């Protein structure tokens, strides 16, 4: 009996120490005073947006941008293949790029050319369906399954890129996840950020870097630039800034396709121009450098434009072959250059984003929530302790010790795994305490019943735990299943509640059944034969 108790007590003490370290961290690094303990606790238990204050954003991913980019690449492949097969056509366009970017129309093609087009599309573009359009035209439409997959991937890639950018800015404990079902939205919560202007700007930039040939400009009016498109096919008009007056918008006629793009970028960093101002210097990948070298050697004397997010940042003459590096000038401040380098290094967003909702929770509101939540938890916990002592006498001490260990395990778990404590999470802690009390009540009432039936204290304890065990398991398993469902389908605060409740219930199974039983056995081991049990 004593041997069994010894190893059980050792297990309980070990669990207590392990999770106590989870709450405060390394004891050697803790200052053992009020402020030191508070600091250690706050470093381990991270507060959520509703407690700490910060910014809540909901973003809409414009997934049609990703579809347009994909169909643009498909159009380039179609043009290349038709040219290789000597098939003529009058035009290849997207009739409704804004609302149906997945549809490509090919006009002015002969029936023989259409046969070649179908063969080429089946081989090179199997994700598109071939069809007939009006007036002898033909269409290629992206299949629904591929279209949905493309949009879903755009959202997941946007989440990853936004997370990388936010992490690089030093925002601690951000929540960045998909929001809603099939709405292509992203939830972003930034605890401790009450002025999100810079973070928003960094998140929203698509960071689409391109280098294209410039055919004309700067023009003071967009219509002047558009006239050049009549003589120069496969060009677009893009806005830029006047070199003499940066506040004035001008326009350039540039090539529709780029020589190199963002995916060819290897590294971006902050540098200095000839006047000591901040600029962004970049290096290209090996493949990008080869293509850039070939392009510049073939266009010596022509103009080259550095384009960021559809705006011409800089135009320069190609004086000689350029290999794998370049600079972006834009009269940047040091902060702007640093942010642009950060964005470029994280990679381009697959689609642009729009802000649907923005809410700022002030720190004062967060502190009020903390005080009210902690006050409610303390009042409830103290009331439970007093009730258990009054109603169950000596056994109430057993229950109270189990509940205290339950809280230590729960908070230690949050410290170890970096779980974020939210206001619903505090509610989960309180509910865990309630479930712990319920487990103890089931056990104690069963022990009382066995004692009234004339059983000895050791036998009553044995029977009480034995009969209450299945009921406790049943209630906890059903509640844990509900918490798992909340975690899978809920958002930030709801997930916090589910995580806190789930682990609290696992801890409760350990404390209510194992720890409480060990305490009873220790008491009975010291009792004289025939001595009554205080319960």
Curated annotation (Swiss-Prot):
Q: What's the superkingdom here? A: Bacteria
Give yes or no: UniProt keyword Ion transport: no
Record carries keyword rRNA-binding: no
InterPro entries associated with the record: Acrflvin-R, SecD, SecD/SecF_arch_bac, SecD/SecF_CS, SecD_1st, SecD_SecF_C, SecD_SecF_C_bact, SecDF_P1_head
Q: Which GO terms describe its biological process?
A: intracellular protein transmembrane transport; protein targeting; protein transport by the Sec complex
GO MF term set: protein-transporting ATPase activity
Q: How does it sit in the membrane?
A: Multi-pass membrane protein
Alphabetical keyword list: Cell inner membrane, Cell membrane, Membrane, Protein transport, Translocation, Transmembrane, Transmembrane helix, Transport
Briefly state the protein's biological role. Answer: Part of the Sec protein translocase complex. Interacts with the SecYEG preprotein conducting channel. SecDF uses the proton motive force (PMF) to complete protein translocation after the ATP-dependent function of SecA.
Question: Family, per the entry?
Answer: Belongs to the SecD/SecF family. SecD subfamily.
What is the designated name of this protein?
Protein translocase subunit SecD
């Amino acid at each position: 009996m004593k041997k069994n108790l010894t190893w059980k007590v050792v297990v309980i003490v070990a669990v207590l120490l392990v999770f106590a370290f989870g709450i405060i961290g390394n004891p050697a690094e803790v200052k053992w005073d009020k402020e030191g303990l508070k600091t250690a606790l706050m470093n381990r238990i991270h507060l959520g947006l509703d407690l700490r204050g910060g910014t809540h954003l909901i973003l809409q991913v414009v997934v049609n941008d990703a579809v347009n980019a994909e169909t643009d690449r498909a159009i380039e492949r179609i043009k290349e293949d038709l040219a290789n097969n000597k098939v003529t056509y009058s035009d290849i366009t997207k009739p409704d790029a804004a609302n149906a970017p997945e549809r490509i129309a090919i006009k002015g093609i002969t029936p023989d050319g259409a046969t070649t087009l179908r063969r080429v599309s089946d081989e090179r573009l199997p994700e598109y369906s071939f069809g007939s359009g009006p007036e002898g035209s033909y269409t290629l439409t992206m299949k629904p399954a591929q279209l949905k997959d493309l949009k879903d991937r755009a959202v997941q890639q946007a989440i990853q890129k936004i997370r990388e950018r936010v992490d690089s800015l030093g925002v601690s404990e951000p929540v960045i996840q998909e929001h809603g079902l099939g709405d292509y939205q992203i939830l972003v919560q930034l605890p401790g950020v009450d002025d999100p202007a810079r973070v928003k700007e960094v998140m929203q930039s698509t960071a689409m870097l391109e280098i294209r040939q410039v055919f004309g400009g700067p023009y003071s009016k967009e219509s002047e630039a558009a006239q050049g498109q009549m003589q120069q096919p496969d060009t677009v008009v893009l806005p830029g800034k006047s070199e003499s007056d940066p506040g004035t918008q001008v326009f350039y006629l540039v090539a529709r396709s780029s020589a190199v793009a963002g995916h060819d970028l290897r590294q971006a960093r902050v540098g200095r121009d000839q006047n000591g101002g901040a600029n962004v210097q970049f290096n290209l990948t090996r493949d990008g450098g080869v293509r850039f070298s070939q392009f510049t050697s073939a266009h010596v004397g022509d103009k080259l434009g550095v384009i960021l997010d559809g705006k011409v940042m800089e135009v320069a003459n190609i004086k000689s072959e350029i290999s794998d590096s370049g600079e972006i000038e834009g009269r940047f401040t040091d902060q702007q250059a640093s942010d642009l380098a950060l964005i470029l290094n994280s990679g381009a967003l697959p689609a642009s984003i729009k802000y649907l909702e923005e809410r700022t929770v002030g720190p004062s509101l967060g502190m009020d929530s903390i005080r009210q939540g902690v006050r409610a938890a303390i009042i409830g916990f103290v009331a439970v302790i007093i009730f258990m002592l009054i109603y169950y006498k000596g056994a109430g001490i057993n229950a109270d010790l189990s509940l205290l260990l339950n809280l230590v395990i729960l908070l230690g778990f949050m410290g170890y795994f970096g779980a974020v404590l939210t206001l619903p999470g505090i509610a989960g802690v309180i509910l865990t305490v309630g479930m712990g009390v319920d487990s103890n009540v089931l056990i104690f009432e069963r022990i009382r019943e066995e004692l009234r039936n004339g059983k000895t204290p050791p036998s009553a304890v044995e029977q009480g735990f034995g009969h209450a065990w299945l009921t406790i398991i049943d209630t906890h398993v059903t509640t844990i299943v509900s918490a798992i469902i909340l975690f899978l389908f809920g958002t930030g605060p709801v997930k916090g509640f589910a995580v806190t409740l789930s682990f609290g219930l696992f801890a409760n199974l350990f404390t209510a059944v194992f720890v409480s039983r060990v305490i009873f056995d220790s008491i009975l081991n010291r009792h004289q034969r025939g001595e009554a049990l205080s319960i």
